[in-house]
Amino acid sequence: MVLIRVLANLLILQLSYAQKSSELVFGGRPCNINEHRSLVVLFNSSGFLCGGTLINQDWVVTAAHCDSNNFQLLFGVHSKKTLNEDEQTRDPKEKFFCPNRKKDDEVDKDIMLIKLDSSVNNSEHIAPLSLPSSPPSVGSVCRIMGWGKTIPTKDIYPDVPHCANINILDHAVCRTAYSWRQVANTTLCAGILQGGKDTCHFDSGGPLICNEQFHGIVSWGGHPCGQPREPGVYTNVFDYTDWIQSIIAGNKDATCPP
């Protein structure tokens, strides 16, 4: 466990610009130690990959564009410098993607469901997050979190994950901001219209939490992050709940919404 922890610390510290689609929390504050019990770290031998969300003891949800070879998942992490005694590491046993996902668009149907090689034990710093019972309404206040950049134009990453509150915005805001590409109906548009708070580099795959339910997956957004009228685009978890539940129940041929 000590060797795994040392490796994980080194990997988390090796953050870089390698993934142009990854996002981070800019304009936030340090999360409280028990505020992110469902937050997962994905990493491999090349470094930190993405965030993820624990939805039960055997399954994690993250962004499809976070997929990589030979990654591991780390649970219960708060500080990169101080070990939590209940931290746990797992390998993916199986990975599931939408079968109708466009192969030439890395953020199309940007969701990956991961079955763990063994169950994670709930603890002081580890607990699953509930799937949504209904979609969030425009204006809802939601929370983002992650170890991504705290200054969009500099390689500055926090020791502990940062959290920030943002709002669900009308889809038209994102369609106007990103008129050069399609903003899918199965996404959420979320942020602050005047800018200053946003997910940013290396927050990809992490959760958007509204009313203590798992509503969104960090997918993509403006560059640099946190600019006025350039909010983040999040996979709408509610639209994929039937697919998630079908896969967990053993129906590996389940399809995603169009």
From Swiss-Prot:
Annotated PROSITE patterns: TRYPSIN_DOM, TRYPSIN_HIS
Compartment annotation: Secreted
Expressed in which tissues: Expressed by the venom gland.
Keyword presence, Hydrolase: yes
This protein's UniProt keywords: Disulfide bond, Fibrinolytic toxin, Glycoprotein, Hemostasis impairing toxin, Hydrolase, Plasminogen activation, Protease, Secreted, Serine protease, Signal, Toxin, Zymogen
EC number: 3.4.21.-
Any single GO CC term annotated in Swiss-Prot or TrEMBL for this entry: extracellular region
Domain Peptidase S1 stretches: 25-249
Glycosylation sites recorded in the entry for this protein: N44, N121, N185
Any one GO biological process: proteolysis
Keyword Translocase belongs to the record: no
Cystine residue pairs: C31-C163, C50-C66, C98-C256, C142-C210, C174-C189, C200-C225
Residues annotated as catalytic: H65 (charge relay system), D110 (charge relay system), S204 (charge relay system)
InterPro entries in UniProt: Peptidase_S1_PA, Peptidase_S1_PA_chymotrypsin, Peptidase_S1A, Trypsin_dom, TRYPSIN_HIS
Signal peptide: 1-18
Prosequence residues removed at maturation: 19-24
Gene Ontology MF: a single term: toxin activity
Subunit field text: Monomer.
Family: Belongs to the peptidase S1 family. Snake venom subfamily.
Job description of the protein: Snake venom serine protease that activates plasminogen.
Record-given protein name: Venom plasminogen activator GPV-PA
Native source organism of the sequence: Trimeresurus albolabris
